Amino acid sequence: MSTHGDYIENVLSEEYTSIRVFKDDEGSKTELFQHNKTDNKLVKITSKNMNDHIFRILRGFRHTNLPTILDVCACEDHICVLEAYVEGETLESLLKKGILPHNVAIGYMLDICAALVFLHSQQIIHRDIKPSNVIITPEGKAVLIDFSAARLISSDKPVDTDNLGTVGYAAPEQYGVYQSLPPTDIYALGVMFNEMVAGIHPSVQTPDGKLGRIIRKCTDTQISSRYQTVGDLAHDLQKYKKYH
């Protein structure tokens, strides 16, 4: 019997051409397809470890700082997700050219904060914020991608059951100390922000003055000492931007 997964595969094979593989490792593959007639592009993600419920939540919304989810399919042994392709350059690639002016970095931070305010309102924690998961569009907008490590906040799971994330950006609680919560994403935001303005991990050095205090509050090892909401962080960033 034909399934929705079969339908997706048939459409891709008949109407699209694979033009690039972004990632292909154990249990996960991310591939770029281009429509044969319109040249429209989409990203196909298959994984044995992703939470399809998260993608089904996101499919019902559109947000300027998040990729549009086009379709989700739970197949026998994996999840298949189709996303609209986000044109642009990764923040990781951009930072290889050097640190960013403070006003530019804050602009990107506010874009990612806007994405996280929405995600957290849906009880979704991203858990893998880093420069390679941020796309800077030709218009200068920052878009947060890759939800393969995301999880839903759970009232009956006091600690994370899977240690996902990236070393250097992952908060201490992601290693089984506590459950991932909004301050978990804020920790990674702070690390990434310091890399944008100082070029190094905040454990080595942070900027002087108010900007450094903001970063240190993001990256405190104690979850209770960090900003508790992304909205609070965005408020301080906007205030800094206004007076500097």
Question: Where are the predicted features?
Answer:
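Activation segment signature within eukaryotic-like protein kinase domains
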Residues: 108-109
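AlphaC helix of the protein kinase catalytic domain
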Residues: 91-100
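Catalytic-loop of the protein kinase fold
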Residues: 120-136
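Conserved short submotifs of the Hanks-type protein kinase catalytic core
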Residues: 76-90
